[in-house]
Amino acid sequence: MSIRNYIWTCAVAMALIGPVMKAQEQITIGVIQYDVCDIDKSFKDLHEQGFGSCELNYSEKRFTKELAEQVKAASKKHRIRVTTLVGVPGSKSTWNFRQGPATIGLVPTDERSEKLDVYRKMIDFCVQAGIPAMHSHFGFIPEDPSSVQYKDFIEVMRGLATYAKERNVMIYFETGQETPITLIRAIRDIGTGNLFINCDLANLLMYGKSNSLDAVKLFGNLIKEFHAKDGKYPDPGNPYELGREVPIPTGDVDFPAVIAELKKQGFKGAITIECELNGTRHDYVIQT
């Protein structure tokens, strides 16, 4: 059994019982590709393991025009669709509730210009490599749409989204740091038409923002990419730290219900297996 079929069976088997829908045939299973030292070999390995897509993790020093050409060639040769370029720029990003709101993404003003420069370089690489989208954690979007901080963020994101739209690149918001309705509101208020969602339901749980099924129902066709990752809600006894990531299916993400809802909505994107538990990501994929 290929890794692709193994993961599909283990993670979402209950949701796939019943008639096979046409939309399912267009869904690809992929991973986040971190190593780009030999992209041809990496894509060859992914294809042989049964994957059909991947996300590329951005590194400013390595992502050159030469690499972009290599990515295009390897993608065509090995039939691996690169769905997004992912990165979270900034030297101070802290993944908790104490410092996170002041350090992650474009909501805080500290390092904002430097982050915007990196985001524009990511968009440029997407153009060079033929990648349709980039995505990131853009910060803890304020819940109050009348706040100065919210309005400032909307203006900054509109500028970045316009830069991407002019180059025919989409931007996906990685979920987690705000409630689903706040993210939907922000996308509407920015209003450039090229903003969508990379839906990471484990993040929404780990940040305590939503349960998995409600989030998918709310996001609807804004979801272009889906991260297969599992997690737990934050510990009420320690409300300053995120919940824990745990192996699929030992967390609180209701994968059978979620996959069924995605199929109902006609989802045709990629399900990307993400693992931040350790460095042996392919081992995790096999063991899941």
Predicted segments with their positions:
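Active-site beta-loop-alpha junctions enriched in small/polar residues
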Residues: 32-36, 57-59, 87-90, 139-141, ...
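Histidine-acidic metal/acid-base catalytic patches
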Residues: 4, 24-28, 39-47, 180-195, ...
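N-terminal pre-domain/capping segments
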Residues: 2-3, 8, 20-121, 127, ...
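A short acidic, helix-capping loop that chelates divalent metal ions and anchors anionic groups
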Residues: 93-95, 105, 142-146, 206-207, ...
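Hydrophobic h-region of N-terminal signal peptides that target proteins for export
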Residues: 13-20
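Active-site acidic/histidine proton-transfer and metal-coordination neighborhood
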Residues: 40, 96-196
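Charged helix-capping and loop-helix junction motifs
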Residues: 67-71, 146-158, 209-217, 251-254
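Short secondary-structure transition/capping segments
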Residues: 66-69, 95-98, 146-149, 184-186, ...
